[in-house]
């Protein structure tokens, strides 16, 4: 297993920092305690959140790798750091919705909690300044954000990932309401990048329908870190 040295800071996003390493083609992802909502307009630091998200992300990414899905995740390096493959990211967010919630309800006047059968797939441009506008494949092609082959593959992978994760969450009495996936390219292959955590998914308790995800921060519901810890506990993840 690689144990690379951290080099210079490559990029610092809203909740993660990416560092170059002495291993060509690999980066270190540092999960910080920063918590944001509304494209960064709301921001707080929540103690231990970075550690929890790193561990949950590692657990989920490993489950996807075990299911034959290419991900950028390689290994956990420290409580809040993971080694990841360096990707050329595609500037799109792929969202799969199993249950109506959030912006879908606001856009279409749909009641929250409606089961979507089949699951709904949506594309968004990754751009905080524009508030991640919803787009379609024609936009992506016309502006050169992705090729048709990449769009087809991302959609296929998004549904495969959703199937794996919906079952994974169901097994621990959680509902995967919706999730955001980001993809990148390495050696002409499409890999799942970024993270899968309560920051990037809506996750409800199966019995009570209580949100256990970042909606608790968005809506000032409190107990954000405790809810993330509950998800880790359900997955029997030992937090460092």
Curated annotation (Swiss-Prot):
GO biological process: 'de novo' IMP biosynthetic process; cobalamin biosynthetic process
Superkingdom assignment: Bacteria
Gene Ontology CC terms, in alphabetical order: cytosol
Pathway: Purine metabolism; IMP biosynthesis via de novo pathway; 5-amino-1-(5-phospho-D-ribosyl)imidazole-4-carboxamide from 5-amino-1-(5-phospho-D-ribosyl)imidazole-4-carboxylate: step 1/2
EC assignment: 6.3.2.6
Catalytic activity: 5-amino-1-(5-phospho-D-ribosyl)imidazole-4-carboxylate + L-aspartate + ATP = (2S)-2-[5-amino-1-(5-phospho-beta-D-ribosyl)imidazole-4-carboxamido]succinate + ADP + phosphate + 2 H(+)
GO molecular function terms noted in the UniProt entry: ATP binding; phosphoribosylaminoimidazolesuccinocarboxamide synthase activity
NCBIfam families, per the entry: purC
Family listed: Belongs to the SAICAR synthetase family.
Protein name per UniProt: Phosphoribosylaminoimidazole-succinocarboxamide synthase
Gene (UniProt): purC
